[in-house]
């Protein structure tokens, strides 16, 4: 593990040396990873996880990014759902919506953040400024931040690091 300083706060970061892909597959084999949002980060993270053998679903509202998800192989009613339904079905809820989107959808999905679930962020405006946004996770769920290290253009391939 590595100690990293994030804006004056030292965090212990689990790297791929301590937590291999094989170990991740074993630990997460019974989890459903719900990617909420298929805009900037959604396609890369969802595709990376799916291509590496994880159980992934996508939550996206109808529109051009929904159509892109279908074109990318996500199947409506099977692996592609509304944001609310994906939040309900997922055990790991990945908030990859825009900052404004996270704030707007929060009242609709917070009821699905039940004990034992994990809320996952890749950017933290809404949760860090929760006194202004109203995004306050329940005390009985885990909250994590996943930082991406991009190895290819447009997030075609990503290496994930988890800050816990």
Which residue ranges define each predicted feature?
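Short, well-ordered alpha-helix to beta-strand connector turns
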Residues: 31, 53, 89-91, 116, ...
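Fold-independent oxyanion-binding glycine-rich loops
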Residues: 38-39, 60, 96-98, 122-124, ...
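Glycine-rich, highly charged phosphate/nucleotide-binding loops
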Residues: 75-84
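Rossmann-fold NAD(P) dinucleotide-binding segment
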Residues: 83-129
